[in-house]
């Protein structure tokens, strides 16, 4: 019982702060954040990707040259998971778990799993590839996949507006 409690406590936590993520993406010189409002068709498209309403009316992002960074949240089983996504030239360069609040599914933070998303692009309303799951972390895998799709969609949206 103590081992189970210790492993669930180990899973929760801040793995990287928003600031540290942005500093890493933009070589310690992140640009000012920009915002998009989720209204009308955009909101409906976001809801279609996530299969539920997004929890906010505004989404912040950071853009410098061809690189865009997104810090987004999605529910795992019960609690939100905070992800950082770096996109360059319409492809995911990196996706990270910044903060994990669940008791299961934390394995999605490992580089071996995240590597599947490197180079991924948007094909219609989905990723251009299948993502292998992790036994016992299905909902966290779905959350990360949804955020990957959402960030690519939003990246395309801000480039075309």
Predicted regions and their residues:
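Bacterial N-terminal signal peptides
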Residues: 1-7
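Flexible, solvent-exposed loop/hinge segments and secondary-structure transition points
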Residues: 11-131, 138-142, 146-161
């Amino acid at each position: 019982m103590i081992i189970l409690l210790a492993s669930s406590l180990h899973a929760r936590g801040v793995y990287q702060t928003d600031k540290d993520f942005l500093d890493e993406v933009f070589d310690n010189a992140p640009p000012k954040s920009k915002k998009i409002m989720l209204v009308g068709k955009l909101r409906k498209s976001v809801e279609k990707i996530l299969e539920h309403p997004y929890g906010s009316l505004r989404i912040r992002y950071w853009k410098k040259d061809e690189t865009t960074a997104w810090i987004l949240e999605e529910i795992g089983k019960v609690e939100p998971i905070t992800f950082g996504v770096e996109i360059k030239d319409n492809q995911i360069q990196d996706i990270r778990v910044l903060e994990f609040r669940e008791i299961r599914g934390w394995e999605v933070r490992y580089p071996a799993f995240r590597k599947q998303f490197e180079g991924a692009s948007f094909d219609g309303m989905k990723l251009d590839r299948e993502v292998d799951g992790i036994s016992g972390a299905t909902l966290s895998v779905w959350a990360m996949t949804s955020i990957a799709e959402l960030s690519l969609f939003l990246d395309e949206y801000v480039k075309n507006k």
